[in-house]
Structure formats: C-alpha cells, structure tokens
C-alpha cells in the first residue's frame, strides 16, 4: 500500500511541481517532502514506519494497564472498549 502511495505521490509531484527560474526538479520537489524523510530514507520508509509513528507506539506500549491503551487505526486513536468480549459466553458461540 505504501509503495502505491509513493508512486502516486511522485507522479503528482512530477506533473505539478513548479520549477524556479533555471532550477532543477529536485529543488521544486524538496520543499514538498517532510523534514525527516530524506532521499536516503525513502527506501527505508517504504518498508518501515516513520519515526513519529514508532514513538507513538512506544508511548502506547508503556501504558500500565492493557485496558487503558489506545486503539489506533489510520492514525486515529481512541480508548479501547472494555471488555472486548462478553463474559457470559464463556468461550461458546
């Protein structure tokens, strides 16, 4: 999914990036990329998450009680519902 995102992003940048007078394509694209994502980290970012995501996960894992951890999906986080399963079923369907 991330690879498709980057291909689409680079196609859009190549089409829409304004070039300054006598500038190179890299100078126009450089302003559109986040500060922590350099060309050296582009390939690594395709297979791993960005540092800010890892820091968020590290803070969530240090939460003392499992029921107090946040549930994150598509960068939206909210408290986990409690309980995840009904207690009256006792493992039966």
Curated annotation (Swiss-Prot):
Q: Pro-region residues?
A: 23-69, 79-93
Q: Which domain of life is it from?
A: Eukaryota
Keyword match Ribonucleoprotein: no
| Gene Ontology MF: a single term | toxin activity
What residues bear D-tryptophan in this entry?
Answer: 74
Q: Which GO terms describe its cellular component?
A: extracellular region
Disulfide feature: 72-77
Q: Where in the cell is it found?
A: Secreted
What biotechnological or industrial uses does this protein have?
A: Given that the SSTR2 is an important pharmacological target for the treatment of acromegaly and neuroendocrine tumors, this peptide has potential as a therapeutic for the treatment of these disorders.
**Residues spanning the signal sequence:** 1-22
What keywords were assigned to this record? D-amino acid, Disulfide bond, G-protein coupled receptor impairing toxin, Secreted, Signal, Toxin
Tissues/organs with expression? Expressed by the venom duct.
UniProt keyword annotation of Membrane present: no
- What else does UniProt say about it? Consomatins evolved by gene duplication of a 'Somatostatin and related peptides (SSRP)' gene expressed in the snail neuroendocrine system. In addition, this peptide adopts nearly identical conformations as in the somatostatin drug analog Octreotide. As this drug, it contains a D-Trp at the same position, whose synthesis is a common strategy used for enhancing the metabolic stability of compounds in drug design. Negative results: does not activate any of the other 313 GPCRs tested. Shows little or no activating activity at the SSTR2, SSTR3 and SSTR5.
Give the function comment from the record: Potently activates human somatostatin receptors (SSTR) with a specific activation of SSTR2 (EC(50)=2.6 nM).
Give the domain section of the comments. Answer: The cysteine framework is C-C.
Sequence similarity? Belongs to the conotoxin C superfamily. Consomatin family.
What protein am I looking at? Consomatin G1
